[in-house]
A protein has these predicted regions:
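Short, structured active-site-proximal loop/turn typified by the sulfatase FGly-forming signature C/S-X-P-X-R
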Residues: 52-110, 215-217
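Acidic/histidine-rich catalytic neighborhood
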Residues: 371, 375-433
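Bacterial N-terminal signal peptides
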Residues: 10-19
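Metal-dependent active-site segment of extracytoplasmic phospho-/sulfohydrolases and closely related
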Residues: 350-393, 464, 538
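Active-site neighborhoods of enzymes that stabilize oxyanions during catalysis
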Residues: 172-185, 198-203, 413-537, 541
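Short, solvent-exposed turn/loop segments enriched in Gly/Ser/Thr/Pro and often Arg
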Residues: 81-101, 219-229, 316, 552-559
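Active-site His/acidic residue clusters
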Residues: 222-223, 227-238, 299-351, 388-390
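Catalytic-site neighborhoods of secreted/periplasmic enzymes
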Residues: 143-188, 193-259, 549
């Protein structure tokens, strides 16, 4: 192998990791329009459109029927509310986030799930933390195809909040937390590891804004979600992602939005942030603290920088509140099909709302509220809202039925493997040479057992995702089959979940989408809208060309017309 090329590649990687970890202060003066100099993007993961409606208007049975998200409601008084907004399909966090920051669907981005499959790659050098086994890779040989792991499994140490990043503070998770030996490898590039930011096929809002001279920052839940930087990895100036699937630890100096100290672990009976209604509030508070620093013109570590032109984060608390059953505490979720929140979900919505109030106050303290466009949405929803519809079926799943017909790395027959791409959806890639119609026939014959709702394959899948396969001209990432089950059926088989996401159902995809700015008049849009429209709207609001986004150009994704109409008055 060419040594010079390896040295050059290593140097480029070092620059990428340095940029994603420490950032390089930039002058934002070249980015912005008359009314918008900054954009704040917030994803309240799991927040349905109806959740926002209920909390802003009140619903009998919660908070004495009074509204319980005053800060969100206040933003709506100078905002445009899109009540028929749809997230990505599949509605997993990874494609959901990519929709927001690229303007594209999985057809363009190549991101179907955080754990998916690529027919042109080979497996990692060492087994990932989530069980994707090490596999051979021969440089420039024909690939065998592999499951691709872009979640906590590629952390150096996913039990640690900092992801195991060497030399980093215990709470400082960044792209430096990624273990290159756990990454899928590309035989066509000499078996080089494929970093998350190079796994995505399109550029992102961060790359476009950074290239135009804007300072960029993002906060999320996995180091792997540094993929939002886009190809090359240089689109982000500051990235912060303490590992959400790490062990729960005390957070000295951090208080929840309601003022409760996180200096000691609030709920020591669980080991995961996502498993506790209380601990997840501390996890979110840690990241809100970082966002407040960025608004003040600092990096997430507190060192000096500038206020980003584009910044934001995701919140985890609402999704935990709507999907978790915590032993000894109670069930989250909803009390009925009208989306009346449980006491646990109610407290998570209230917690996030207070945090948003703190963030808005920080913008005002910095003197930039009047020229900041605030977009609040969700990567995904969660299904079912109606608690009587939930069916956890981890035995009769499409992947189980197909068994040896799917790659061993994905198969439930592999007891130590990472598992199939199944939540309240089943995304299936078949082994090379397997018959898709034969596999579909097996699924159809067992429709009742698997709670089959709809099968997408052939033209019904290719229409929106392209033609997948192993042959030249076929998309190596497009699945062969997607199964959406009946409403409420989930294939994870979890005993601690009462809802899930990833599917195409209304509850999975109808998410909150509110765009707020002091110059906007309140407006409700009932027409169908897609979260992919957020990306071109952000770029245009900052005075840049939305067509600079490759997915927007490829798919013809429009801006949110109502936002632009009011901003341009």
């Amino acid at each position: 192998m060419n040594v010079k090329r390896l040295v050059t590649a290593s140097a480029a990687l070092a620059v990428t990791l340095s940029a994603l970890t420490y950032g390089v202060a930039a002058d934002t003066s070249t980015v912005g329009s008359e009314k918008v100099k900054h954009v704040l993007l917030l994803s309240i993961d799991g927040m349905h459109a109806v959740d926002f409606y209920n909390c802003a208007h009140g619903i009998a049975g919660a908070n004495d029927g009074n509204p319980y998200c005053p800060n969100l409601a206040k933003l709506a008084s100078t905002g445009i509310n899109y009540v028929a907004a749809s997230s990505s399909k599949p509605s997993d966090s990874a494609p959901g986030l990519m929709a927001l920051v690229t303007g594209g669907s999985p057809k363009s981005t190549g991101i179907y799930y955080d754990v998916a499959f690529d027919r042109t790659l080979d497996g990692p050098e060492t087994t990932t933390g989530t069980g994707l086994a090490a596999a051979p890779c021969t440089p420039f040989a024909i690939p065998t195809g592999t499951t691709t792991d872009n979640d906590q499994g590629i952390d150096i140490d996913d039990t640690k909040l900092n992801g195991g990043a060497p030399g980093h503070a215990l709470t400082d998770g960044t792209a430096a937390s990624i273990d290159p030996k756990k990454l899928s490898r590309n035989p066509a590039a000499g078996c080089a590891p494929v970093y998350p930011w190079n796994f995505i096929r399109t550029n992102t809002i961060f790359g476009v804004i950074h290239a135009a001279g804007g300072y960029t920052a993002w906060i999320d839940k996995h180091p792997s979600y540094a993929m939002v930087a886009g190809p090359g990895g240089t689109g982000l100036d500051d990235y912060y992602a303490p590992e959400v699937d790490s062990n729960v630890v005390a957070l000295p100096g951090i208080k929840t939005s309601q003022g409760v100290s996180c200096a000691t672990v609030r709920d020591a009976t669980v080991s995961s942030w996502n498993a506790s209604f209380e601990d997840i509030q501390c996890y979110d508070a840690l990241r809100v603290d970082a966002l407040l620093k960025e608004i003040a013109g600092k990096r997430h570590t507190g060192s000096q920088a500038v206020t980003p032109a584009i910044m934001g984060m995701n919140f985890q608390a609402v999704y935990t509140g709507e999907s978790v059953s915590e032993p000894g505490v109670g069930n989250g979720g909803y009390q009925n099909a009208a989306a009346l929140p449980s006491a646990e979900l109610l407290q998570e919505i209230e917690s996030v709302d207070i945090s948003i109030g703190d963030i808005v106050n920080a913008l005002k303290d910095k003197g930039i509220y009047d020229d900041t466009l605030i977009i609040i949405t969700a990567k995904h929803g969660g299904s079912p809202i109606d608690p009587t519809r939930y069916v956890a079926d981890g035995t009769n799943t499409p992947a189980t039925l197909l068994g040896t017909r799917i790659p061993y790395s994905e198969s439930p027959l592999n007891s130590t493997g990472i598992g199939a791409t199944e939540d309240d959806v089943s995304v299936l890639w078949l082994n090379k040479g397997e018959s898709v119609p034969s596999a579909v026939e097996i699924l159809e014959q067992n429709a009742t057992a698997i709670g089959l709702g709809q099968i997408y394959y052939g033209p019904t899948l290719a229409l929106n995702y392209g033609v997948g396969g192993w042959q030249p001209g076929q998309d190596p990432r497009t699945p062969d089959i997607i199964v959406t089950p009946n409403v409420g059926v989930t294939y994870s088989g979890s005993t601690t979940m009462i809802a899930d996401h990833g599917g195409f159902a209304h509850d999975d995809t109808n998410v909150m989408l509110l765009v707020s700015h002091p110059c906007l008049s309140p407006q409700t849009v009932f027409a169908e809208t897609a979260t992919t429209q957020v990306a071109p709207t952000i770029v245009k609001a900052l005075g840049l060309n939305p067509s600079a986004l490759t997915a927007v150009k490829a798919e013809g994704t429009p801006v949110l017309a109502e936002v632009w109409s009011q901003l341009s008055r």
